[in-house]
Amino acid sequence: MNMMLILLMNIALAAILISLAFWLPHLNVYTEKANPYECGFDPMSSARLPFSMKFFLVAITFLLFDLEIALLLPLPWAMQFPNMNMLMTMAFILITILALGLAYEWTQKGLEWTE
């Protein structure tokens, strides 16, 4: 019951914050505020260049493997429980899914930096 109450409160808070951010107007939007800050100098080129997908893919790959470490880090403390078969099965499934994702990324040449 307490978990459901906390879950509903979190969903309500998230909905309120999203609706406030969506419906509140942007205050004081003018060109100086929208321009990038270049230490007082005139910009040499456009600062609104498109973001490279290579950087994005590296960041997402790093995030996935960082999540893997965060999920597997408590494993030694959890090994004190008597039912380790389920725990090891879940850890093996997680590592297998991530290894398959890495293999797919490698075969699609997503890890190669040269174009």
Swiss-Prot record:
**Keywords per UniProt:** Electron transport, Membrane, Mitochondrion, Mitochondrion inner membrane, NAD, Respiratory chain, Translocase, Transmembrane, Transmembrane helix, Transport, Ubiquinone
Membrane topology per the record?
Answer: Multi-pass membrane protein
Q: Where are the transmembrane segments?
A: 4-24, 55-75, 86-106
Q: Which domain of life is it from?
A: Eukaryota
GO CC annotations on file:
mitochondrial inner membrane; NADH dehydrogenase complex
Q: Main location per UniProt?
A: mitochondrion
Question: What's the Enzyme Commission number for this chain?
Answer: 7.1.1.2
Q: Name one GO molecular function term.
A: NADH dehydrogenase (ubiquinone) activity
Question: Catalytic activity annotated for this protein?
Answer: a ubiquinone + NADH + 5 H(+)(in) = a ubiquinol + NAD(+) + 4 H(+)(out)
Q: Name one Pfam family in it.
A: Oxidored_q4
- What does the entry give for GO biological process? mitochondrial electron transport, NADH to ubiquinone
Question: Where is the protein found, in the record's own terms?
Answer: Mitochondrion inner membrane
Into which family does the record put it? Belongs to the complex I subunit 3 family.
Q: What does this protein do?
A: Core subunit of the mitochondrial membrane respiratory chain NADH dehydrogenase (Complex I) which catalyzes electron transfer from NADH through the respiratory chain, using ubiquinone as an electron acceptor. Essential for the catalytic activity of complex I.
Subunit structure of this chain's protein: Core subunit of respiratory chain NADH dehydrogenase (Complex I) which is composed of 45 different subunits. Interacts with TMEM186. Interacts with TMEM242.
- Mind telling me what this protein is named? NADH-ubiquinone oxidoreductase chain 3
Species of origin reads Microtus pennsylvanicus (Meadow vole)
**Gene of this entry:** MT-ND3
